[in-house]
């Protein structure tokens, strides 16, 4: 029973590391292909990563053109 909290903490660390890796891949893809004059940025949300554009009001998902 003592290892259950440790297991949960390790699971949370692994999930945040996976999100960070996905975010860096998305940022690298943005650097290679600038979207809308480099107005794009990556935002972490509760549901994962979103590609947003500074030209829109708020965080508009800019996966589509």
Swiss-Prot record:
Superkingdom of origin organism: Eukaryota
Disulphide bridges, residue numbers: 52-62, 53-59
UniProtKB keywords: Disulfide bond, Hydroxylation, Ion channel impairing toxin, Neurotoxin, Secreted, Signal, Toxin
Keyword Secreted (UniProt): yes
Modified positions (4-hydroxyproline) in chain numbering: 61
MF GO annotations: ion channel regulator activity; toxin activity
InterPro entries associated with the record: T-conotoxin
Segment forming the signal sequence: 1-18
Propeptide: 19-49
Expression sites (tissue/organ): Expressed by the venom duct.
Pfam families: Chi-conotoxin
Protein location: Secreted
GO cellular component: extracellular region
Domain remark from Swiss-Prot or TrEMBL: The cysteine framework is X (CC-CX[hydroxyPro]C).
Family: Belongs to the conotoxin T superfamily.
Function: Probable neurotoxin with unknown target. Possibly targets ion channels.
Identification of the protein by name: Conotoxin Cal1.5
């Amino acid at each position: 029973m003592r290892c259950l909290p440790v297991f949960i903490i390790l699971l949370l660390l692994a999930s945040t590391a996976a999100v960070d890796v996905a975010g860096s891949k998305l940022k690298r893809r943005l650097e290679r292909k600038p979207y809308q004059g480099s107005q794009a940025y990556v935002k972490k949300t509760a549901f994962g990563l979103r590609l947003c554009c500074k030209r829109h009001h708020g965080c508009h998902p800019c996966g589509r053109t």
